[in-house]
UniProtKB/Swiss-Prot annotation:
The keyword Transmembrane applies. It comes from Vaccinia virus (strain Copenhagen). This is Protein OPG162. SUPFAM superfamilies: C-type lectin-like. It is found in: Virion membrane; Host Golgi apparatus. Belongs to the orthopoxvirus OPG162 protein family. The keyword Membrane applies.
Amino acid sequence: MKSLNRQTVSMFKKLSVPAAIMMILSTIISGIGTFLHYKEELMPSACANGWIQYDKHCYLDTNIKMSTDNAVYQCRKLRARLPRPDTRHLRVLFSIFYKDYWVSLKKTNNKWLDINNDKDIDISKLTNFKQLNSTTDAEACYIYKSGKLVKTVCKSTQSVLCVKKFYK
């Protein structure tokens, strides 16, 4: 094999620097193009289509009116739940969707339950505790209406909003 002289080696070095720079630039540009083309697969949205993202949660207006039992079932099918009565998002949800909707509060046999999981709720921690505590009905369910929790019959039909955490 024939060895190259100093001038030829020097010329190759001078030509290889711009070529290397061009290769680096084309690799970066190609990477950006690939990312933009596949961004939905590489960085999926926190919430699925139709769900509204707010403060690490996804909210869906089902556009259906139904009883509490059916509302809980509908949200479970979507791997979600009804909004809790103690969440600070209730007012925001009302301003976004502008409708009365079920919350997961139910009074049955003088016990206050979260109907998403049938666990007891300490209503003294809720903002309108005094109003809730004055309820004498044996059974009552609640909707969020114009800034407050309002008692209603559990079998009545109301709007259903479902909530779930990001990426579930």
